[in-house]
Amino acid sequence: MRLVLLFLFLFYAASASTENLPQPPAHHLSDGTYANTNGVPYESSFKKLMQWSWERRSKDLSTFKFEMEKPNYKEIYNNDNIVTTWIGHETFLYQNKDINVLTDPHFTDRASPLSFAGPKRYMPPGMEIEDLPNIDVVTISHSHYDHLDYRSVKLISEKYEDVLFLVPLGLEEWFINKGIKNVRELDWWDSIKVSDTEITFAPVQHWSARGLFDRNETLWGAWHFKNYYHSFIHLGDTGYSDDFKEIRKRLGSVDLAAIPIGAYEPRWIMEVSHMNPEEAVMSFLDLEASKAIGMSWGTFILTDEPVSCLLYTS
């Protein structure tokens, strides 16, 4: 009888202690991967990719050249003003009178693991790395090759020894393996203060991978910056979701939002992970942003929408 009572005591004690353990966030799955806040997965089967590849054969995917404005280097090097410079694709130089931030830096010719194949840049960067002012922080939204470019981040880390790389959960190891040590990974809603600027990593609807077998093993998201003078959010890549309303609820409205408007066709394969221009406007309204800049267009031909349409939309 005593043995039975002892067993029951140990069983219920173990159950109670398990219940009191902190549970992982809902977007942390048991297999070590991550999920969107609403659980919506990105599904791209081999059959779908082959169908898309076949359909693209009959489409006009020619590039569209447009005139580039020269950066205002006087303002950029002054550092006493709030200046946001679109360098191309989703790369921005953001200066808020406190720190200089570079988002998703991509300065090379291809968005690809290969230097001789893959989507080729058809518009040069608005600035070259050697023309940049001092950079305090580099943010990476997710691991795709058009957002995390090895050669670009390596050159930046070599030029600016003290630059801090802020990356999604799971990506810190990649940077350390590449010899970049000053890196900090954040989960959704984690914040870090750099000088007088609060930087928060927020959820959006997307996915991650750098190879065939690492789907969603690292997180993805948006970067929100706020100090006394200004607030800015860089959404990265994202489909339309309620995440924008939650960002507004938790972090407040922003002065400026960098919103992706490209890489959205065909909708039957891109809808979950990329907004079209109409959805981009909806995200702008959800965020209650004062101003917005369209990004993720005019640099690489990644999907099927005409570039001329994006030029008009932006």
Where are these regions (language model features)?
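Sec-dependent N-terminal signal peptides
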Residues: 3-12
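Metallo-beta-lactamase
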Residues: 14-120, 125-131, 168-234, 255-262
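Active-site neighborhood of phospho(di)ester-bond hydrolases with catalytic His/Asp-centered motifs
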Residues: 103, 135-143, 166-168, 233-238, ...
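Acidic/histidine-rich helix-loop elements
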Residues: 107-124, 207-215, 265-274, 301
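Active-site metal-binding motif and surrounding structural segment of the metallo-beta-lactamase
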Residues: 117-167, 252-258
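Active-site-proximal loop/helix segments of hydrolase catalytic cores
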Residues: 151, 208-287
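Conserved small/polar residues in nucleotide/adenosyl-binding loops
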Residues: 312-313
